[in-house]
């Protein structure tokens, strides 16, 4: 097994966060009274609205800024944001769907081997930091992609990046580094 061989790694996207604007003022009290699946947080000045399909949660401010979380793809996030804008239009607001942007993607990837974290950190010191007393994972930052990876000794990697493409590229870039710090599999023969 070498680092150059093509290994199919499954990258599971667990959360996509997007933001958009409505270009109109939103009456939070009206949304709370007439909307479905809403929680009015008056002390904070926002409304939480949940959609069932796609399964997303939106944080709505009176300024018209809306943050949607919980989608599992960029397409699903946009579809959910549009459904949310449509439901606000049905409540009587003059909503115009603008400034849609995916701001964060969280994904999980499992390597087919375990990783020696102290060795990995020593080999990649400027980008990697490992504090086993504080957190069981190595924090590895790729500034060019604006991605952060949490690398666990079990081979599980949690990736946070600005979009799905950056997350996939980050996993491709990290694979050779974690491969050289992999744990050897011991085989017992009798």
From Swiss-Prot:
InterPro entries: TBP (IPR000814), TBP-like (IPR015445), TBP_dom_sf (IPR012295). It comes from the Eukaryota. SUPFAM superfamilies: TATA-box binding protein-like. GO terms for cellular component: cytoplasm; male germ cell nucleus; transcription factor TFIIA complex. Keywords: Cytoplasm, DNA-binding, Nucleus, Transcription, Transcription regulation. GO terms for molecular function: RNA polymerase II core promoter sequence-specific DNA binding; RNA polymerase II general transcription initiation factor activity. GO terms for biological process: acrosome assembly; DNA-templated transcription initiation; dTTP biosynthetic process; spermatid nucleus differentiation. It is found in: Cytoplasm; Nucleus. Coiled coil: none annotated. Belongs to the TBP family. Binds TFIIA and TFIIB. Part of a specialized transcription system that mediates the transcription of most ribosomal proteins through the 5'-TCT-3' motif which is a core promoter element at these genes. Seems to also mediate the transcription of NF1. Does not bind the TATA box. This is TATA box-binding protein-like 1. It comes from Pongo abelii.
